[in-house]
Amino acid sequence: GTGKTRRLRSLITEKKLATKNFRYVCLHEGFEYRDFIDGFYGESFIDGEFKALCKEALNDPKGEYYFLIDNASAASLDKIFGEAAVLLDRRYDEEDELSLIRTKNSHVIDGFEEGEKARASVLLKDGRSYFAVPKNLYVLCTLSEHKCVSPSIAKAFRWIRCECDYGALEDYLRDREIVNASAVVAVCKALNKFIADETGGLCAIGHGVFMGLARYQSGAQIMQEGLNGFFAEVLEPIFRCAASGEDVATSLGERIAEAKDVFKF
C-alpha cells in the first residue's frame, strides 16, 4: 500500500513508452522459466517475455526498453530468470565473452534449422545459440518488504524503499472533508511504529491501505467504531495473509490483538 505499483506504472506514462518498448508483468506462483526465457508449449518452442524483449532491445541499440515486474516476490526470480540472472549486472559487450551465456535450452536451439535457430536465439556465435541482456534494457521490480529474493538477484538492482506517506494520507482524508484527519493519521503512525518496534511477523501498512479509512467515516469524522471496523475488515486479513508459514496461530493472534490495542484514539 505504499504506491509501488502506481510508481512502476507511471513510468510508462512519464517516458511516453510505445507498446513495443516495454513489457509489464505481474507475477504469481504460476510463472515458469519458459514464460520468461523460453521453452516448449506443446510442440512449439516459444520465446518468453524477457527473452523476446532482450532481442528487440539488442536490435535497436539507440532505443530504451523497460521490463517491469510487479509483485516480484510472488514467484522465484531465480527459477524464472534461470541462467539469465547472472547477466542482469553483466550486460552484453562484444568485447566481453562472459556477457554471453548458454542457457539450458541452447543445445536444443542448436539443433534447429538455420532460420529457426536464428529466430530462437538472442545471439548466434560460431553457429551456436547464446543469451545476452543488452545495456539499453532496464529491469524494474516491486516486491513487499517482508518477502525476500536471493542475494544473486538482489545484487543486480539498486533498491529504493517505499514507505507510508503520511502527508499524502492526511491530504486524502482532508479532501474528503474528514475533520479529524490529523488524529486519524496519528493513530496510523502509532500502529506502524508499534509494528516496527515491538512485534515480529506483522508487516508495516502503507498509505494506500490507510486511505480506505475514508469509507469508515461517520458525520465527517472517523470514530473509534470506524477504526475498529477497518482493523477487523482490512488490517487483520492483511496481517494474516502476510504472515509466514512458520508463525504459530496463537502467537500471531496475540500480536494482532496487541496491534489492535494500539489502533485507537
PLM segments and residue spans:
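C-terminal regulatory/interaction module of P-loop NTP-utilizing enzymes
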Residues: 1-265
